Design a protein with these regions (language model features):
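Alpha/beta enzyme core
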Residues: 4-16, 28-53, 59-74, 84-195, ...
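Short catalytic-loop micro-motif centered on adjacent basic/acidic residues
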Residues: 20-24, 79-80, 102, 199-202, ...
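Short, N-terminal intrinsically disordered low-complexity segments that are rich in Pro/Gly
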Residues: 20-27, 52-55, 255
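Active-site-adjacent C-terminal substructures of enzyme catalytic domains
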Residues: 180-182, 197, 254-259
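Short glycine/proline-rich, acidic loop/turn segments that cap or connect secondary-structure elements
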Residues: 227-247
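Extended, intrinsically disordered, low-complexity segments
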Residues: 240-274
Length: 274
């Protein structure tokens, strides 16, 4: 089926107390693994591409792959720009045929974040896309002093910008944790009560499963997974290389078990929040 937007999958997921997995992809294997997992679990999936890949043609190539995968599936598939850093990147996403984008203005002063996100929403909506915003910067490693979001900020931001989904800081971090994180589930619940749109949990990798389930039940309908997905890829490549001991094998055949390993991880994450 054709690619869909966040509004086609997230509101229903929130109403059901479930979430849709958003898997970061960078190449054919990761995109295929995400789709294989969705098919295996019979659930929608969000294929998202990190903003760095918009610096060259990789984001365009991934868009073509995602579109082909979606057209050959009966499942809803969203193609999403992850952590867009500028309005220009949102415009690139429009040009490349993405159906959704994130503008991450969380490092900006709050008023400036609102103003720039308003423009990002206008660009996205004019193109028939959805737009995810962010408040309360989500760091790359967990620290004692995480800048947490507040229900008041969330409500003000949503009302002022018209975003379709909102990422908030509740204690998660991108990457792998050096110690068990403090996930503020009560805060997550209060923020969800303050806004009517779906919320987004960034830093889903390595966050304890029980905490992910609790947060999803509050109204967080999009779960981002990147680091764990990529680590499985790297581990599988090393494992397969060791098996071959330098012997020749066609690359596509070599990559089959790597893709399967990624798909298994993705399927487990989908089951976790379904």
């Amino acid at each position: 089926m054709p690619l869909v937007t966040l509004n086609d999958v997230l509101p229903q997921a929130r109403a059901e107390g479930r979430a849709i997995c958003a898997l970061n992809v960078t190449n054919c294997e990761s995109a295929k693994a995400a789709m294989m997992a969705a098919e295996r679990e019979n659930r929608p999936v969000i294929i998202q591409v990190f903003q760095r890949l918009f610096g060259d043609d990789k984001a365009r190539y991934v868009a073509a792959m995602a579109r082909s995968l979606a057209e050959n599936s009966d499942l809803p598939v969203v193609l999403h720009l992850d952590h867009g850093q500028s309005l220009e990147q949102v415009k690139q996403a429009v040009e490349y045929g993405y159906t959704s984008a994130m503008f991450d203005g969380s490092k900006l002063p709050f008023d400036e974040n609102i103003a720039t996100t308003q423009e990002a929403v206008r660009i996205a909506h004019d193109a028939g896309m959805t737009l995810e915003g962010e408040i309360g910067h989500i760091p790359t490693t967990a620290t004692e002093d995480l800048p947490l979001s507040t229900p008041e900020e969330a409500a003000e931001f949503v009302a002022a910008t018209g975003v379709d989904a909102l990422a908030v800081a509740i204690g998660t971090a991108h990457g792998f944790y050096k110690k068990v994180p403090t996930i503020h589930v009560d805060l997550a619940r209060k923020i969800a009560e303050a806004v009517s749109i779906p919320l987004v949990l960034h830093g889903g990798s390595d966050t304890p499963d029980e905490k992910v389930r609790e947060v999803v039940s509050c109204g967080f309908a999009k779960l981002n997974i990147a680091s764990e997905f990529f680590q499985v890829f790297l581990d599988a490549v090393i494992r397969e290389s060791d098996k071959r001991a330098g012997a020749f094998i066609p690359i596509d055949i070599f990559m089959n078990p790597v893709t399967e390993a990624m798909s298994e991880l993705a399927a487990a994450k989908i089951r976790l929040v379904s």
